[in-house]
Regions:
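Phosphate-handling substructures
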Residues: 13-14, 18, 23-28, 70-131, ...
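Short amphipathic alpha-helical/adjacent loop interface patches that line ligand
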Residues: 37, 41, 129, 133, ...
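Short, well-ordered beta-to-alpha junction loops that form the rim of enzyme active sites
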Residues: 54-58, 80-81, 110, 148-152
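Active-site-proximal alpha-helix that buttresses catalytic centers in soluble enzyme cores
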Residues: 4-77, 101, 122-123, 165
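Glycine-rich phosphate-binding loop signature in dinucleotide/nucleotide-binding domains
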Residues: 45-48, 136-143
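Acidic, low-complexity terminal tails and accessory targeting/binding regions
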Residues: 1, 84-104, 140-141, 155-185
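Beta-strand elements within well-structured catalytic alpha/beta cores of enzymes
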Residues: 1-4, 53, 143-153
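Short active-site segment of divalent metal-dependent hydrolases/proteases
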Residues: 9, 153-154
């Protein structure tokens, strides 16, 4: 299974500069983020990907769409792989707004408000990651899946920190990380 962190978002750009939450809910990609998404699509076009799972945040969808178009695949939106709610950027967009912004994506099964109402404890994110790991391990074709997600969820799933637009491979049948260091670079 391939995990891809979304490209640079407006939040990422401002937070990196100031180390302060800029108050941007569900930010979109920056021009660099779009270039990172296109670069990921080009790199992943040679892979045998048959399924794309994506978080419902705009930045993740914008990152996944170039890959989906290049491979001729649809997106399966799943809040299970969403970011850990910790900052303003983790306030999502309602399903109805996402459906208008991305008419080529099916949001019918998504709740109108799909993100948590308050900050998510680390144990809760790690629990979501464990559930996702088990669901993927039960599939015969997990090796042909791309998951477009976020720093916090990928950290909970693998114990590894990934940069915007970076991908890594993961075997969901392998043991989970023994401990998670929630320190963001």
């Amino acid at each position: 299974m391939i995990l891809l962190r979304h490209g640079q978002s407006e939040f990422n750009l401002l937070f990196t500069e100031t180390r302060k939450d800029p108050g941007i809910a569900d930010p979109v990609l920056t021009p660099l983020g779009h270039r990172q998404a296109e670069a990921a699509a080009e790199a992943l076009a040679r892979r045998d990907i048959r399924r794309i799972l994506v978080s419902p945040y705009r930045r993740a969808i914008q990152t996944a769409l170039p890959v989906a178009r290049r491979l001729g695949l649809g997106l399966t939106v799943t809040p299970l792989v969403r970011e850990r709610y910790a900052f303003s950027c983790d306030i999502g967009s309602p399903r109805s707004e996402l459906a208008l912004a991305f008419p080529e994506v099916d949001f019918a099964h998504l709740e109108e408000v799909w993100w948590p109402p308050a900050e998510e404890p680390a144990a809760q994110v790690e629990g979501r990651a464990a559930l996702f790991r088990a669901e993927m391990a039960a599939l015969d074709d997990w090796a042909h899946t791309l998951v477009v997600s976020h720093w916090g969820f990928i950290m909970a799933l693998t114990g590894r920190s990934v940069a915007n637009g970076e991908s890594l491979e993961m075997d969901p049948t392998a043991p989970a990380p023994a401990a998670i260091s929630w320190r963001h670079p």
